[in-house]
From Swiss-Prot:
One of its GO terms (molecular function) is structural constituent of cell wall. GO terms for cellular component: extracellular region; fungal-type cell wall. Residues 179-214 form a coiled coil. Glycans are attached at N206, N232, N237, N328. It comes from Candida albicans (strain SC5314 / ATCC MYA-2876). Keywords: Cell wall, Coiled coil, Glycoprotein, Secreted, Signal. Residues 238-248 have a biased composition (Basic residues). The gene is PIR32. Residues 1-21 form the signal peptide. This is Probable cell wall mannoprotein PIR32. Residues 180-189, 198-209 have a biased composition (Low complexity). It is found in: Secreted, Cell wall.
Length: 422
């Protein structure tokens, strides 16, 4: 009788455990295979599946043209730089004078995250049709009117051309950046002096070779050379040369003219100024390369290893060209092998309702995509080979989706930004 009572209790207990595993993928399948089919269409080298730093995303809406159609935002072409960035007032500048320009700071439309893992973009005051309210109530709001105005000014500066951005950045550079430019100028001057010295040494070597050739012509004329050939052919041992004009016994040097080398102090061995080789080691070496060849060799040495040899793992070049100030609510993400994670180590995925959110430690049951994320060379977040997402209004904020779910959805791109303390 007791056995009959225990069996229903165990059955109910197992049903409770099964229902509590809502976030576990069905049948224990590997959720990392939940990738968009378009991942196969990604062009090699145009998408980066891993980033070595924490980043955020900023909404960049599509532009509505005169015909009522949405056009993709124009991506400004920025030359990537391998240099480390340093924060200076509101501008991020590279640490070398050869930097293509400063990184714009974006504080508007940055994506935030709430406690349950959903990602949102807060609506600004200018997003509403009617304003109002007490200004004192907005003192603690991250998106108050003052911050919005400052963000609008910065966004306006970001829309200017790269040349205007360079001019503006020159007005806000700190004293440390000016000192860095002076150091870079001194370094450039030193490099120019070294190149000048190398050219002078090359000219001296060329002049020395011309003098030697002229001396050879003075002592060895064409008639003497022909006489030597005839005399050597008539002798059984023709390994030694004898001139009619002057014997060559016990002459050590290259041209066989001891007087010439004594006059020019070449009767002794000398050390090479760079490699420490003796003169005899350079007798049959190839001529020294010209300055153009030396520059090409230096450029080849300075090239990354992946450009020298095929199959070598390429050096990392960051595709992120902008930065943003982060707060406690800012969405902070990492990207590793196509998988997004937030600061709580939850998985970035597209759930069954096509909403972009973070769940974990495993994706939500019924999730559509949980992998296949990347960053394009233009610094945009991509899912598969697509950089197009949708922001859909929901009260005082927007949610993000990979497909439009209602009429209040608008296409956007998600620009990746480095997160910094401000």
């Amino acid at each position: 009788m007791i056995h009959y009572l225990i069996f229903p209790i165990l059955l109910i207990f197992f049903q409770i455990i099964k229902s509590s595993g809502y976030y576990v993928p069905a049948n224990g399948d590997d959720w990392t295979i939940l990738k968009p089919p378009s991942c196969k269409n990604k062009l090699p080298g145009q998408y980066i599946d891993s980033l070595p730093f924490t980043f955020g995303i900023v909404v960049n809406p599509y532009i509505l043209n005169e015909d009522g159609d949405y056009e993709k935002p124009i991506v400004s072409k920025i030359k990537p730089s391998l240099t480390t960035t340093t924060f200076v007032t509101s501008i991020i500048t590279t640490s070398t004078a050869t930097a293509p320009g400063s990184k714009p700071t974006k504080t508007k439309d940055i994506i935030v995250q709430i406690h349950d893992g959903q990602v949102q973009k807060m609506k600004h005051k200018h997003d509403y049709s009617s304003g109002g309210g007490d200004d004192d109530d907005d003192d603690e709001d991250c998106f108050d009117e003052k911050n919005i105005d400052m963000a609008a000014k910065r966004d306006y500066q970001d829309m200017n051309t790269q040349e205007q951005a360079n001019e503006d950045s020159g007005q806000v550079l700190a004293e440390s950046d000016s000192h860095q430019q002076v150091v870079d100028q001194n370094q450039q001057i030193n490099e120019e002096e070294e190149e000048t010295q190398e050219q002078q040494m090359q000219e001296e070597n060329n002049n020395t070779n011309e003098i030697e050739d002229n001396k050879v012509q003075e002592f060895e004329t064409i008639e003497e050379i022909y006489d030597d050939i005839d005399n050597n052919e008539s002798r059984p041992n023709n390994s030694k040369k004898y001139h009619k004009k002057r014997p060559h016994n016990n002459y050590e040097n290259k041209h066989g003219h001891k007087d010439y080398h004594e006059d020019h102090h070449h009767n002794h061995r000398y050390k090479d100024h760079e490699n420490g080789h003796e003169e005899d080691d350079h007798k049959w070496n190839k001529p020294k390369p010209m300055p153009e060849q030396e520059e090409q060799e230096q450029e080849q040495e300075q090239k990354p290893k992946h450009e020298k040899s095929e199959g070598y793992e390429s050096e990392f070049v960051s595709p992120v060209y902008s930065v943003a100030c982060y707060t406690n609510s800012t969405l902070k993400m990492t990207l590793t092998d196509g998988i997004l994670r937030d600061s709580d180590d939850r998985i970035g995925c597209i759930v069954s309702g096509h909403q972009f959110q973070f769940d974990g430690p495993t994706p939500q049951h019924g999730a559509i995509y949980a992998a296949g994320w990347s960053v394009t060379k233009q610094g945009q977040l991509a899912l598969g080979d697509s950089t197009k997402f949708y922001q859909c209004a929901s009260g005082d904020f927007y949610n993000l989706y990979d497909e439009p779910i209602a009429f209040q959805c608008h296409p956007v791109t998600l620009d990746v930004v480095e997160l910094i303390e401000c």
